[in-house]
Amino acid sequence: MRMSFGLTFKRTAKVHWRANFSQQCSLRSTGLFVPPSPPLDPEKVKELQRFITLSKRLLVMTGAGISTESGIPDYRSEKVGLYARTDRRPIQHGDFVRSAPVRQRYWARNFVGWPQFSSRQPNPAHWALSNWERLGKLHWLVTQNVDALHTKAGSQRLTELHGCMHRVLCLDCGEQTPRGVLQERFQVLNPTWSAEAHGLAPDGDVFLTEEEVQSFQVPSCSRCGGPLKPDVVFFGDTVKPDKVDFVHKRVKEADSLLVVGSSLQVYSGYRFILTAREKKLPIVILNIGPTRSDDLASLKLDSRCGELLPLIDPR
């Protein structure tokens, strides 16, 4: 069950936004959104190596913390997460579905942020997990991220728990469209539209003024004329039951669980930690800062994912 079909990663045509956003994003500092962490503890690295060596059916769950080193911020990290830097909050599912103006605002902001968000590339942590899969160490990978970076790194035994921003769905007929194709439709409908944006979010959102949003034209489904929504689980929505059941089965098949870059504050991911605990699986957590499940972990590491994971030999 690979949840990553229908992706294209070509760069889209140039869009009209003012220089300060593109210059800001072009810095691509890998440390911009990564919280400070202590130096690697050699003894803990050895413990993680021992854990991986003994694991025969390892399940890995990743969160936003694995992608901060690729230049995509997370929500909750102290000082550098979206919640710490701004008073903005993610869009709510009910608001998006019910309100055309909310959808217009969302898509205008997403249109501006898309070229930078979609151009982000995997970092050493993504490549390490892909290599673990290739060498037969990884039983399954569950990501809470919507950035497609695991897919770009070549991971195939993958479930995108919250969907993927690289796909768009019609709310009426379910027609699926690659996000890059929709970007071209946006450009055709808004040939002279421009905006000044600030602050990329974990889902590719940026911040615009209401005046900039009001003139933005949003296309409808090319098949039925219905409203379009990214194929992701917005806040206030729930993961589909069949996907939850699928991941529960993968957890029950596993003999160990590694959490990478997640505070586990969201129940959609935390519930699988509870399943692992019920099954008495050893749990290791790699995340800078406290998590909801630190008391359940046999080992907790506060290190950069891209610094630590490549040091581990999966064989």
Curated annotation (Swiss-Prot):
Active site feature: 162
Catalytic activity line of the entry: N(6)-[(R)-lipoyl]-L-lysyl-[protein] + NAD(+) + H2O = 2''-O-lipoyl-ADP-D-ribose + nicotinamide + L-lysyl-[protein]; N(6)-biotinyl-L-lysyl-[protein] + NAD(+) + H2O = 2''-O-biotinyl-ADP-D-ribose + nicotinamide + L-lysyl-[protein]; N(6)-acetyl-L-lysyl-[protein] + NAD(+) + H2O = 2''-O-acetyl-ADP-D-ribose + nicotinamide + L-lysyl-[protein]; L-cysteinyl-[protein] + NAD(+) = S-(ADP-D-ribosyl)-L-cysteinyl-[protein] + nicotinamide + H(+)
Binding site for Zn(2+): 170, 173, 221, 224
Similarity annotation: Belongs to the sirtuin family. Class II subfamily.
Function: Acts as a NAD-dependent protein lipoamidase, biotinylase, deacetylase and ADP-ribosyl transferase. Catalyzes more efficiently removal of lipoyl- and biotinyl- than acetyl-lysine modifications. Inhibits the pyruvate dehydrogenase complex (PDH) activity via the enzymatic hydrolysis of the lipoamide cofactor from the E2 component, DLAT, in a phosphorylation-independent manner. Catalyzes the transfer of ADP-ribosyl groups onto target proteins, including mitochondrial GLUD1, inhibiting GLUD1 enzyme activity.
Additional remark text: According to some authors, ADP-ribosyltransferase activity of sirtuins may be an inefficient side reaction of the deacetylase activity and may not be physiologically relevant.
Name of the protein in question: NAD-dependent protein lipoamidase sirtuin-4, mitochondrial
Organism: Bos taurus (Bovine)
